[in-house]
Amino acid sequence: MKHLFKLDPAKNLPHNSVTRLIHSGTDGFIIGGTDNLQTEAVENLYELLAETDLPIFLEVSDESMILPEAEHFLIPVVLNTENSKWTHGLHKELIKEMGEFIPWKRVTSEGYVILNKDAKVAQLTEAKTDLTEEDIIAYARLAENIFRLPIFYIEYSGMYGNPEVAKKVSAALDDTKFWYGGGIRSKEQAAEMAEYADTIIVGNIIYEDIEKALETTTVFAKKTV
């Protein structure tokens, strides 16, 4: 997967955009958000995407994001927080309550590093965002070599990140996949981050300018003679 659209169930999609997003050339969708999450809204959004055979990932930030019919679940582990609630605390409580019924083969964990101090998700998780490049690379190596996480996700959440950081993170990882999300608002930015990240995540621009959002998939289009 090179490209994923991230959809927030608490936001209204632009009119007639779902079919265009599905047929844009993206590799799949993440459904996830930070606040005002309701199971009904998650179900409605999931059903809107039902016509696609592309993977739909539910990013489980609370219980409202859990739909039994979903095929793929992403479990965020926030690495750059000192509040254990977001590294394993909530996870343990959910497993304690539902562990017997969790479809583990459909679950993928992702190591998150949140780097925009003004983002809601940074404030919610008490993320320490004033990190050096060395800090970020250390988190990448921690995710891969200590926690054995399959995904390392740098999240700038609405702000475009530093391509040089992405380049160094990419070089530090061998097997763990590097996902980048945050502030991609043009095909040029998509191409720049895609040079280093295994997967780029495009979110906010969907709600701001659907045409520019759709253009971000074109950087992966196969060239024909």
Curated annotation (Swiss-Prot):
InterPro entries named in the record: GGGP/HepGP_synthase_I, GGGP/HepGP_synthase_sf, GGGP_HepGP_synthase
Signal peptide residue numbers: none
Amino-acid positions noted as binding Mg(2+) in the UniProt annotation, renumbered to this chain: D8, T34
Protein EC: 2.5.1.n9
Obligatory cofactor(s): Mg(2+)
UniProt entry keywords in alphabetical sequence: Lipid biosynthesis, Lipid metabolism, Magnesium, Metal-binding, Phospholipid biosynthesis, Phospholipid metabolism, Transferase
UniProt keyword rRNA processing present: no
Superkingdom per UniProt: Bacteria
Reactions it catalyzes: sn-glycerol 1-phosphate + all-trans-heptaprenyl diphosphate = 3-heptaprenyl-sn-glycero-1-phosphate + diphosphate
Broad class of enzyme this protein falls into: transferase
Pathway: Membrane lipid metabolism; glycerophospholipid metabolism
GO terms classed as biological process: glycerophospholipid biosynthetic process
Molecular-function annotations in GO: heptaprenylglyceryl phosphate synthase activity; magnesium ion binding
Binding site for sn-glycerol 1-phosphate: K6, Y153, I154, E155, Y156, S157, G158, G183, G203, N204
Subunit structure: Homodimer.
Family in the record: Belongs to the GGGP/HepGP synthase family. Group I subfamily.
Its job: Prenyltransferase that catalyzes in vivo the transfer of the heptaprenyl moiety of heptaprenyl pyrophosphate (HepPP; 35 carbon atoms) to the C3 hydroxyl of sn-glycerol-1-phosphate (G1P), producing heptaprenylglyceryl phosphate (HepGP). This reaction is an ether-bond-formation step in the biosynthesis of archaea-type G1P-based membrane lipids found in Bacillales.
PANTHER family, sorted: HEPTAPRENYLGLYCERYL PHOSPHATE SYNTHASE, PTHR40029
Record protein name field: Heptaprenylglyceryl phosphate synthase
Organism the protein comes from: Listeria welshimeri serovar 6b (strain ATCC 35897 / DSM 20650 / CCUG 15529 / CIP 8149 / NCTC 11857 / SLCC 5334 / V8)
Gene expressing this chain: pcrB
